[in-house]
Each structure stands twice: as C-alpha cells, then as structure tokens.
Amino acid sequence: MPESFEEAIDAYGLTFFKVKVSGVADADIDRLCRVAAVIDAKVPSYSVTLDGNEQFSSAEAVADLLARVKEEPRLARFAASILFVEQPIARAHAFEKPVKVLAAFKPVEIDESDADIDAFVTARGLGYSGISSKSCKGFYRSLLNRARVAQWSAEDGIAYFMSAEDLTTQGGLAVQQDLALASLIGMT
C-alpha cells in the first residue's frame, strides 16, 4: 500500500486531484506550491479541483487567493489545470452576493449550500455554474439538477456542470447506490 502522495500517484496512476484550501491565503499558496511541485514532477497531464470547504467569508477573499494562484510562477501548470472551485464560501454567506468575480477565473460550484430543491436555481442567479451530486441529498434531486444542467447549458450557452461526490452513508450497499447514481447522470 502506498504511504505517501508520490507513492499513491505511482500506484494508482492518479491524474485527477481534489485539493482543499483553508481560507488562509499565505498558507494556501505555500501548500499549493508544494502539492503542485509533486504533481508537476510525476504527472504529464492532470486536472485539479479546489475545494474551499466553506472556509472563506466572501467571494472577494476567494478571488484574492485565485489571483495569487494565477500570478505564482510555480503554480502555472496547476492553475491551468483547475477545472472548478467547489463551495469556497461558508453556506451562511454563499447566497448573499454574486460570485461572478470568481467565475471569471474558474467555474464555481455549490455543495454544502445545496440545502433544498431550489438551491441550484438561486445559485445560478448569483453566478455559480455547478452543483455536486450526493446520494445523501436525494436521488431525485440529482436527476432534477442533471436536467437543469442540460437545459440551462443549451439555453444560456454556458457550460453548467455537476460533479459526483464521494460521500456514502454506510458501507456496502450505499457504495453501489452512489456509483449507480453517478453513472446514471453521466458522472463517469
């Protein structure tokens, strides 16, 4: 079994990475540079998502971090490989202001803020273009949001998207349910 990040990349052939950020810009830049150095050295072509995990109080704070990521020479490949930013703003503030300043850098998705059936509708109006799918949020909500992604993308010419989360509620059957849902909505 691999015991380090480098060994995991070698053992599993990893090319997609979900990287957490803390909301403390200096610490995040330092950590991202260290993570990027490993990935850049080991993986010829890769994709990254940044997970803010509700650690930021505002879109401006996230935009500041993203600007620094873009400006940091050691993060050039890493920045170009970012697919989207996941739920950077605390759910209590996520729907207070538009996030268009963030979306200008990379698409932004809601995750923890997806508290009710119309959360994605609200988020769309503020500039979010993505939403996560988790079995714990409900099978039908994932189907509805998948339909919204298809319809809104066709109507607006914007690439709305969904991501499949790795959250399961219990071992065994729940894993198969999550995988079946991800496959059904095209997240494979």
Each predicted region: which residue ranges?
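Catalytic domains of carbohydrate-active enzymes, especially glycoside hydrolases
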Residues: 4-22
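Catalytic core of soluble alpha/beta enzymes
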Residues: 19-173
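Acidic, Ser/Thr-rich peripheral helices and adjacent loops at domain boundaries
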Residues: 181-188
